[in-house]
Amino acid sequence: MNIKIIGVGKLKEKYFRDGIAEYLKRMDKFAKVKIVEVADEKAPENLSEAEMADVKAKEGDRILGKIKDKEWVIALAIEGKQRPSEVFAKEIADLGTYGYSDITFVIGGSLGLSPAVMKRANDTLSFGKLTMPHQLMRLVLMEQIYRAFMINIGSPYHK
């Protein structure tokens, strides 16, 4: 299985990079995991609705440029589908069973994802109504993907 995580912006803090590196190492035996960063659009404070839409569209174009046709895309969004870890694990396993070996997760920038990215997504995922920095969301997502693999092999990691 190939898993790609596309995120807007760079990870600046070493502790986030270290956490992600740890989960990349742990998942190496289950999947090939690739992190892809796309540039965030520099935007001043107090943007108008039109300016916010323009920022999301530009970031969205960069994201879409990193997605191949055959990839199953899951967009992370506050309004996405919430599910327990066990259900998420089963969905990941089922995707592999049904021939989707390339799964791409997309994390937007500070303004969220563009309508074009949401339209391209095959599914959505939400970890709740909380707003989180995209750097933290990458780490949380990595842990949940790892947890899914642990659930699927019956490991005591998930209690």
Swiss-Prot record:
Compartment(s): Cytoplasm
Swiss-Prot/TrEMBL keywords: Cytoplasm, Methyltransferase, rRNA processing, S-adenosyl-L-methionine, Transferase
The catalysed reaction is: pseudouridine(1915) in 23S rRNA + S-adenosyl-L-methionine = N(3)-methylpseudouridine(1915) in 23S rRNA + S-adenosyl-L-homocysteine + H(+)
Q: Where does S-adenosyl-L-methionine bind?
A: L76, G108, F127, G128, K129, L130, T131, M132
Name listed for the protein in its UniProt record: Ribosomal RNA large subunit methyltransferase H
Annotated family: Belongs to the RNA methyltransferase RlmH family.
User: EC number(s)?
Assistant: 2.1.1.177
Give the PANTHER family listed for this entry. Answer: METHYLTRANSFERASE, RIBOSOMAL RNA LARGE SUBUNIT METHYLTRANSFERASE H
Q: What class of enzyme is it?
A: transferase
| Keyword Transcription found | no
Question: Would you say which domain of life the source belongs to?
Answer: Bacteria
From the UniProt record, which GO molecular function terms apply? rRNA (pseudouridine-N3-)-methyltransferase activity
Instruction: Relate the protein's function as given in its record.
Output: Specifically methylates the pseudouridine at position 1915 (m3Psi1915) in 23S rRNA.
CDD domains associated with the record = RlmH-like
Instruction: Provide one Gene Ontology cellular component.
Output: cytoplasm
Whether Cytoplasm counts among this entry's keywords is: yes
Subunit comment = Homodimer.
